[in-house]
From Swiss-Prot:
InterPro entries: Glcn_transporter. Keywords: Cell inner membrane, Cell membrane, Gluconate utilization, Membrane, Sugar transport, Transmembrane, Transmembrane helix, Transport. It comes from Pseudomonas aeruginosa (strain ATCC 15692 / DSM 22644 / CIP 104116 / JCM 14847 / LMG 12228 / 1C / PRS 101 / PAO1). This is Gluconate permease. The chain crosses the membrane at residues 6-26, 30-50, 60-80, 116-136, 142-162, 183-203, 233-253, 269-289, 312-332, 338-358, 366-386, 430-450. It is found in: Cell inner membrane. The gene is gnuT. One of its GO terms (cellular component) is plasma membrane. GO terms for biological process: D-gluconate metabolic process; gluconate transmembrane transport. Belongs to the GntP permease family.
């Protein structure tokens, strides 16, 4: 078409579609949910897909993603809400601060975010934990940026690299990776990466941009928990990490027991992300609810409140899944896969690059993960011996790069930390880029020994 080969046309079509998606979201302020649907429809029509297949492909992608991630998001959000309102998140922060001391308080904030952020989306984790940044800064006298950047790094690293976060879980489903191995490798990569991008970079940049919180905002959100009867550190940690433990146990059972063994069959069910998070939520109803004196009405109200803010996130994720499926069904993914094989590009590097481009284009780490995985997955069949778990991590690392003005997280950080756009680029955007690049380096190093 237009004097081009079919493959070249498909690549150009995909490029034009993604540019159009950027323009719709950034220039015309179209909601990402609507913009993704329009982009998916445009790609389907212009790529030559049969009309009846266009809607079906989008529907399959939308439903396939939400049938899994929608449940994960709801359960994780409920768990996070109970943890925050019971004072569990505050207990983790207080305990780590006592353990690390004032001089190393920024390290404790990274670990607190790392632990608390496991069941939460970045934006939700940010809203739940930002009061702790203000409280700790006030108590310790340490710079807001020196404390805040490590917390943001911990949340972002978990968001992009560690299941049961929805982003990595989506990529696990697309690539057919093992969840237990991905958790293990994700932790190996995420901890040192967050340490470099968080406490180390935060200590450096805070010398030049210390951060001055809005007095009005501090007064509004930096209050102590309503109850001083906080759950213990051990109980909080056990509750939050229960789903991770169950998923790791499933992987152990898959390795240690043969197919058809009763224990393995049970662990396959119990260690499934949905089952694991459901069990953790049921435990949290007691540890973060009834044991703290909350009655059934209050718990029900908290759970209802937790679901309302996730509606937009769920719809955007679903539309991202539909767009991803359109890229696959139109043949764009196969074209890129064959190009990667012919150019002899490392699949890990390709996964990182594709996710990075989509992240910069759309501003959404989750959309970048979904779409990037869908584009790169054909490479698995073309290049034998590819480590699927590292592809998941590479896609997640790429999805974190260069957060800028088309990312809601950029404005969230700017407003809460009372920074100018320039300061936000020098702190938040730089931190996200360090996370992405350093994460890739660790993934490539890990690939040498796996």
């Amino acid at each position: 078409m237009f004097g081009m080969s079919h493959d070249a046309y498909l690549l150009l079509d995909a490029l034009v579609t993604i540019i159009g998606l950027i323009v719709l979201i950034t220039r015309f302020k179209v909601h990402p949910f609507i913009a993704l649907i329009i982009a998916a429809g445009f790609l389907g029509l212009t790529s030559g897909m049969p009309v009846e297949k266009i809607v079906k492909s989008f529907q399959d992608g939308f439903g396939g993603v939400l049938g899994f991630v929608g449940v994960i998001l709801a359960l994780g959000t409920m768990l996070g809400k109970l943890m925050a309102d019971s004072g569990g998140a505050d207990q983790i922060a207080r305990t780590l601060i006592r353990a690390f001391g004032k001089e190393r308080v920024h390290w404790s904030m990274m670990l607190a975010a790392f632990l608390v952020g496991i069941p939460l989306f970045f934006e939700i984790g940010f809203i739940l934990l930002i009061p702790l940044v203000f409280i700790v800064a006030r108590r310790s006298g340490v710079s807001l940026i020196k404390i805040g950047i490590p917390l943001l790094a911990g949340l972002s690293a978990v968001h992009g690299l560690v299941p049961p976060h929805p982003g990595p879980l989506l990529a696990i489903g697309v690539f057919g990776a093992d969840i237990g191995k991905t958790i293990l490798y994700g932790l190996i990569v995420a901890l040192p990466t967050a340490a470099i991008a968080g406490p180390l970079f935060g200590a450096l940049v805070s010398r030049y941009i210390p951060g001055t919180p809005s007095a009005e905002l501090v007064e509004q959100i930096a209050h102590e928990p309503e109850t001083q009867d906080l759950p213990s550190f051990g109980v909080t940690l056990a509750t939050v990490l229960l789903p991770v433990f169950l998923m790791l146990l499933k992987t152990f059972a898959d390795v240690a027991f043969p197919d058809g063994h009763a224990f393995r069959a049970w662990m396959d069910m119990i260690g499934h992300p949905i089952s694991a998070l459901l069990l953790a939520l049921l435990v949290a109803l007691y540890t973060f609810g009834y044991a703290r004196g909350f009655d059934s009405k209050k718990i029900l109200r908290l759970l209802d409140q937790s679901l309302a803010p996730t509606a937009a996130i769920v719809m955007i994720i679903g539309a991202g899944g539909g767009f991803k499926q359109m890229l696959v069904a139109s043949g764009v993914g196969d074209v890129i896969g064959h190009l990667a094989v012919n150019a002899q590009i490392s699949p890990i590097l390709l996964a990182w690059l594709v996710a990075a481009v989509i992240r910069i284009a759309t501003g959404s780490a989750t959309v970048a993960t979904i779409t990037g995985a869908g584009i790169v997955v054909p490479v698995i069949d073309l290049i034998p011996g590819v480590n699927r778990e590292l592809l998941v991590l590479a896609t997640g690392a790429g999805s974190l790069i260069l957060s800028h003005v088309n990312d809601a997280g950029f404005w969230l950080v700017k407003q809460y930390f009372n920074m100018s756009v320039s300061e936000t680029f020098k702190t938040w955007t730089a931190m996200e880029t360090i996370l992405s690049v350093v994460g890739l380096v660790f993934i490539l190093l890990l690939s040498l020994v796996l």
